[in-house]
């Protein structure tokens, strides 16, 4: 078998502690575990070694740990673990088919087409599938040799035009938006440099078709550079098993071509001439391919240069657009600010106008109130002035009063003080004097005439205190009123003070009231 050359026997002991240690050691060495699994599943036993003197009771054998066949990060039950089984008997059942692979773990997918004699089965890991393929390929089942190979991956896509900075993880992350991805690999050369190609394997066909359609219709970019990936269905090649002799069909063409063994053509022969022409054609194809590759490479470089220049131009255009947008925004903000200032000015002007109007209204209202108060306060003021004039002797409430006296013939305002009541200090007789001017007339209610002498010249007292005569008009120097007074008899001065004005040289300012309506001044 294929894997038997790499087989290495594993010793298993009965001691559980040493058994676990050996199992962990077997888990660290994947080739050893795979070989042990292959031997165990094949039912072959290696030749037992000589028993050790230190451990004579040890028994030799093999142990298999399924987890040791999984690589770090490897997914289970993927499309890469799917096997195609051909040349099956037509009467095989699903239970018989499962029983055939039961030694390689629990399968997850079993499909049988009895009419055409083939089926599919999916195992847990790729390593188990390889072991099962190596062990069961060519096995005779009901007189039919089984043909087992890996099934074609119907959900695999080839990705071209990849950037040198794209990794397996980025490729898987990019295509995970279409559906679950089982594997994504970027192909590299012998130096580990990216070739710009890769493949993506999906868990099912619908996500693969979706990715193929979306990437074909649009431009799917993986990096900043606007370099779209080219997605195509993956071409399936069996580069592991190839075409063995046992699978060759023995046709007439097969036997004709196999008549001559492998050899070199001799120069100058018919074989050599046409072999040379075939080589020239291949060389021309190679040259043309190289020229095409060179042209494509130059075109790619030119496109990259143009793309770089266009990118800078595009960035400048974006910057200009952004600058214009900002300028437009600033202009709009300036307009808004001006409008706001204009509104504020208008509001301020309205407020000022309202304030001015209110002040004018308040002033007008205050003036009206002041005028109303003045109009309301005119009568009390007038009465107070009138009362003051009355108290000063200009006018009484019951008639005009003449401030003149019988003993003071001169009217008010004339030179020289009037004599007091026409008497001197030593004699009660009358003192002759100049005739008195016009005195006050009687009021409508019988105001006394202050111009009548109280004692006549002969010492007799007049019984008639108020002389009979027509009423005179009120007159007063302060009130600007004129009146007439009956002339009185002159009084002669008697006493030490003689030859001058009678009395003490002063007239009675308040007059002499002896009537019933007499009003004292003091």
Swiss-Prot record:
GO BP terms in the entry? activation of innate immune response; innate immune response; membraneless organelle assembly; negative regulation of DNA-templated transcription; regulation of circadian rhythm; regulation of DNA-templated transcription; rhythmic process
Protein name stated in the entry? Paraspeckle component 1
Residue(s) carrying Phosphoserine: 408, 472, 476, 508
Q: Which residue spans adopt a coiled-coil conformation according to this UniProt entry? A: 282-376
**What segment(s) does the record annotate as region Sufficient for perinucleolar caps localization and interaction with NONO?**
230-357
Give the superkingdom in one word.
Eukaryota
Where would I find the RRM domain in this sequence? 81-153, 155-236
- Identify the main location: nucleus
Q: Region Disordered: start and end of each range?
A: 459-522
Q: Which InterPro entries match?
A: NOPS, Nucleotide-bd_a/b_plait_sf, PSP1_RRM1, RBD_domain_sf, RRM_dom
Q: Does the keyword DNA-binding apply?
A: no
Q: Its quaternary structure? A: Forms heterodimers with NONO; this involves formation of a coiled coil domain by helices from both proteins. Found in a RNP complex with CAT2 transcribed nuclear RNA (CTN-RNA). Interaction with NONO is required for its targeting to paraspeckles and perinucleolar caps. Interacts with SFPQ. Part of the HDP-RNP complex composed of at least HEXIM1, PRKDC, XRCC5, XRCC6, paraspeckle proteins (SFPQ, NONO, PSPC1, RBM14, and MATR3) and NEAT1 RNA. Interacts with ALKBH5 (when acetylated); interaction with acetylated ALKBH5 facilitates recognition of N(6)-methyladenosine (m6A) RNAs.
């Amino acid at each position: 078998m294929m894997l038997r050359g790499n087989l290495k026997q594993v010793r298993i002991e009965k001691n559980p502690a040493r058994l676990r240690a050996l199992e962990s050691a077997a888990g660290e060495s994947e080739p050893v575990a795979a070989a042990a699994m292959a031997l165990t599943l094949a039912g072959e036993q290696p030749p037992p070694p000589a028993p050790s003197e230190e451990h004579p009771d040890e028994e030799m054998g093999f142990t298999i740990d399924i987890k040791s066949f999984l690589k770090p990060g490897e997914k289970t039950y993927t499309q890469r673990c799917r096997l195609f089984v051909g040349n099956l008997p037509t009467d095989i059942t699903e239970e018989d088919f499962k029983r055939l692979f039961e030694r390689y773990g629990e399968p997850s997918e079993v499909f049988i087409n009895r009419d055409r004699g083939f089926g599919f089965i999916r195992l847990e890991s790729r390593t188990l599938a390889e072991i099962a393929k190596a062990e069961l390929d060519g096995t005779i089942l009901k007189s039919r040799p089984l043909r087992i190979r890996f099934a074609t991956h119907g959900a695999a896509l080839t990705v071209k035009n990849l950037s040198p900075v794209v990794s397996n993880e980025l490729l898987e992350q990019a295509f995970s938006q279409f559906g679950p991805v089982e594997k994504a690999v970027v192909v590299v050369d012998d130096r580990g440099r990216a070739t710009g190609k890769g493949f993506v394997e999906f868990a099912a066909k619908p996500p693969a078709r979706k990715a193929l359609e979306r990437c074909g219709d649009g431009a799917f970019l993986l990096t900043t550079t606007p370099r779209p990936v080219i997605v195509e269905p993956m071409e399936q090649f069996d580069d592991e098993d190839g075409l063995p002799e046992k699978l060759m069909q023995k046709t007439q063409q097969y036997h004709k071509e196999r008549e001559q063994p492998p050899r070199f053509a001799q120069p100058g022969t018919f074989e050599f001439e046409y072999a040379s022409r075939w080589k020239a054609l291949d060389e021309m194809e190679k040259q043309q391919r190289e020229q095409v590759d060179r042209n494509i490479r130059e075109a790619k470089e030119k496109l990259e240069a143009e793309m770089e220049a266009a990118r800078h131009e595009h960035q400048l255009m974006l910057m200009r657009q952004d600058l214009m947008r900002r300028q437009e925004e600033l202009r709009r903000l300036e307009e808004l600010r001006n409008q706001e200032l204009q509104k504020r000015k208008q509001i301020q002007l309205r407020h000022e106008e309202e304030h001015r109007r209110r002040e004018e209204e308040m002033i007008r209202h205050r003036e009206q109130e002041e005028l109303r108060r003045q109009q309301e306060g005119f009568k009390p003021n007038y009465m107070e002035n009138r009362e003051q004039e009355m108290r000063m002797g200009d006018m009484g409430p019951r008639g005009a009063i003449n401030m003149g006296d019988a003993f003071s013939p001169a009217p008010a305002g004339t030179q020289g003080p009037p004599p007091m009541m026409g008497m001197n200090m030593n004699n009660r007789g009358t003192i002759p004097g100049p005739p008195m001017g016009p005195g006050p007339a009687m009021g409508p209610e019988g105001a006394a005439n202050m111009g009548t002498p109280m004692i006549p010249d002969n010492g007799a007292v007049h019984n008639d205190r108020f002389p009979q005569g027509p009423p005179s008009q009120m007159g007063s120097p302060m009130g600007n009123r004129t009146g007439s007074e009956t002339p009185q008899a002159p009084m002669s001065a008697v006493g030490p003070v003689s030859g001058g004005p009678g009395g003490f040289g002063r007239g009675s300012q308040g007059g002499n009231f002896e009537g019933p309506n007499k009003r004292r001044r003091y």
